């Protein structure tokens, strides 16, 4: 006997969360809970404004349509990426095919005063991997901050994300302020320039490795081993079904590229599932999941060690 519930939710964000020049005041999304006999599974559907191709309203319509079909015995996954991801997670949980083991390590997202960051990063236990968003301020300032951190913490490796913010000139201004001796400790810089060709040229000219992120979701993207490209950053909410995520990880690994499972600012429920996916598909790589601190609450499932209050499903708006 099949049954299903669909919930809609909204989480207040901390002030100062800006995506593509838009302030994100709340994170809005949906949960689906699927029950099949004694088995149940949850999934999160939360399109990311400015990044997802679908709106929340479009995702909601696609989800409700799919759930009604599933209750009648249909099984084809929806095509809308965030819905395909959430539904496939719920189905995998119900079927017992999403492993419980999780990788709760998170490359911390560094913001704030650089001097404070040096102290925090120096005290980090284990493998020191951290992430910095660049391209929000002046490229020269970004270069100076990155150089300062790499100089002050000799065993630190940084992941940088520019979200295609720079012109070739600005990218070069950034690189000019990073000591060539430290550049090998930049694990990768995600999409420094507006075009792939400009990003490739940046990698060639500076020796700073780059990673593809937005490119993975473009129709003409092909996985290939290229000089200067070290990684791909896979955001499942933007990618689609678990099977598609798995195919992309496999394609990257076959070419010797690092695959990083990364957050699209999901709620704690979605983040804990991403931690499980990372432990399953990319066990050697610290995932990029340090986004819960941007929110004011957790929901349904807790992230281990987080002091944020957790809202139960009883408090969510039920649509079905």
Swiss-Prot record:
Its cofactor is a divalent metal cation. Mg(2+) binds at residues 161, 190, 213. It is an enzyme of class 4 (lyase). One of its GO terms (molecular function) is magnesium ion binding. InterPro entries: Enolase-like_C_sf, Enolase-like_N, Enolase_C-like, Mandelate_racemase_C, OSB_synthase_MenC1, OSBS_N. GO terms for biological process: menaquinone biosynthetic process. CDD domains: OSBS. Belongs to the mandelate racemase/muconate lactonizing enzyme family. MenC type 1 subfamily. HAMAP family: MenC_1. This is o-succinylbenzoate synthase.
